[in-house]
Every structure is written in structure tokens, then in C-alpha cells.
Design a protein with these regions (language model features):
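Cytosolic juxtamembrane N-terminal segment immediately preceding the first transmembrane helix
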Residues: 2-35, 39-42
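Extracytoplasmic
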Residues: 29-55, 59-61
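Central cavity-lining transmembrane alpha-helices of secondary-active solute carriers
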Residues: 69-84
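C-terminal ends and interior cores of transmembrane alpha-helices
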Residues: 100-125
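Cytoplasmic helix-loop-helix junction between adjacent transmembrane helices
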Residues: 135-173
């Protein structure tokens, strides 16, 4: 995964121009992390909004609990495991890559209902739930790629004295 390698270190610069550039870049980094993580939430939470509509195909909430549970398991595993990968990656590429993959997996969630034609073939319901569980696992897996790069850039771009304030503002992205 060479394309995810972090960029090379730049030589240190000083002076008023460097200070102005540093402040501007910090604002850009914070804004990118905030919007990026908010986008992860918008993508990941779509399935919950579709649950009431799935009842017309004979799928009830308890059956969909399997799919939702897979998301939680994958999200927890990925969040834990991807921290070490994220630490050795370029956050500018890692964060959007996860968001794109998460979005693709979520967009595919409509496939089981339409492709299996549950309206006319209710006997395919369990297969559809299984496919949704697998896709929701992928949504959780790729969705776990959001926090590690955000946490890392916050610690790199903000001092210990600023971090509490910036992280509490950033947490509004949830």
C-alpha cells in the first residue's frame, strides 16, 4: 500500500509568513477532519433510516438486528486494528479512501432488496438479510477508518493545551 505512505517531512521554516501559513493549514486540517468525520456518520447511519421501509418486504426489526450487529462488530474491530495502519499512512488519503469505500458498501445495501425482488419472492428474505449483514459489516469495517487519521492529525497539529478545546469542537461532527 505504497500510495498510502505518508508524505516526506518538509524542512522547517520560520518567520511571519510561516506562522500565517501554519495557522491557515491548521484551520484546513481541522475543517477537513470535521467535515470528513461528519460525512462518515451520514453514510453509516443511512441503514437505520431504511429499516421502517423494509417492513413492506416482510423483514422485521429483529431480523435486521443481525445486520446492525455486524456493523458494530466490524466497526469496533476496524477502529482498533486500523489505528496502527493509519499511523503509518497519509491521513489525507486514508480518511477519504475509507469514506469512499464505506459509501460504496452502503450504496450496495439496496441491491439485496431489488436484485432478489423481495416484493415477488418473499422466500428469499433470509438471503437478503445475510447479504445486508455482509454489506453492513463492510460499512462498519470501512467506517472504522475515520477516527484514527482524525485523532492523529489533531495530535500533530494542535498543542496539548489546545487539544481539549479542538477535540471537543471536533466531536460535534458526531
Amino acid at each position: 500500500m505504497n500510495f498510502l505512505s505518508p508524505p516526506p517531512f518538509l524542512p522547517e521554516t520560520t518567520g511571519p509568513e510561516a506562522d500565517a501559513r501554519y495557522k491557515r493549514l491548521r484551520a484546513q486540517v481541522f475543517t477537513g477532519a470535521f467535515i470528513g468525520y461528519a460525512a462518515y456518520y451520514l453514510v453509516r447511519k443511512n441503514f437505520a433510516m431504511a429499516i421502517p421501509m423494509l417492513s413492506q418486504f416482510g423483514i422485521d426489526k429483529s431480523e435486521l438486528g443481525i445486520a446492525l450487529g455486524m456493523n458494530a462488530v466490524a466497526y469496533a474491530l476496524r477502529k482498533f486494528l486500523m489505528g496502527s495502519v493509519s499511523d503509518r499512512s497519509d491521513a489525507r488519503k486514508f480518511l477519504p479512501l475509507g469514506l469512499v469505500l464505506c459509501s460504496i458498501a452502503m450504496a450496495c445495501m439496496a441491491v439485496p432488496v431489488t436484485w432478489l425482488d423481495l416484493a415477488h419472492h418473499p422466500e428469499r428474505k433470509m438471503l437478503a438479510i445475510g447479504i445486508m449483514a455482509g454489506l453492513n459489516f463492510l460499512v462498519g469495517w470501512f467506517g472504522g477508518m475515520g477516527w484514527p487519521p482524525c485523532g492523529r492529525v489533531m495530535t500533530h497539529w494542535f498543542s496539548q493545551n489546545e487539544r481539549g478545546t479542538m477535540m471537543s469542537i471536533w466531536n460535534c461532527a458526531h
